[in-house]
């Protein structure tokens, strides 16, 4: 079945194929291409941020990584010991609650659509 040029599938028919975020399906979110792209960008940003926090560069001096004269490499989140603990806690929280916890959806008409009635749930799937 197609609608507006995109493929539409029942929410419960293939939950893992809708942008690979089944949790959103449970909330009845209508996924459009711009919304999917935004979700992908948020996931990439979070992944890069978390990768920085656990990178082995944190324990290396600048000379060991070929950056003589630059100084020690520290991500901004590690400016103090307290921030280090907070960053570690945040990393654990993200892994438990998912990458979109606390994120605001972009302003998009799809976000303002009413939720479908029970038994009529549909969402536009986008291939990632």
Swiss-Prot record:
Predominant subcellular localization, coarse grouping: cytoplasm
Protein localization: Cytoplasm; Nucleus
Biased composition (Polar residues): 77-87
Keyword Cytoplasm appears in the UniProt entry: yes
Region (Disordered): 77-128
Keywords (A to Z) from UniProt: Cytoplasm, Nucleus
Source species, domain of life: Eukaryota
One Gene Ontology cellular component annotation held by this UniProt entry: nucleus
Subunit composition and interactions: Interacts with PRDX6.
This protein's name: Saitohin
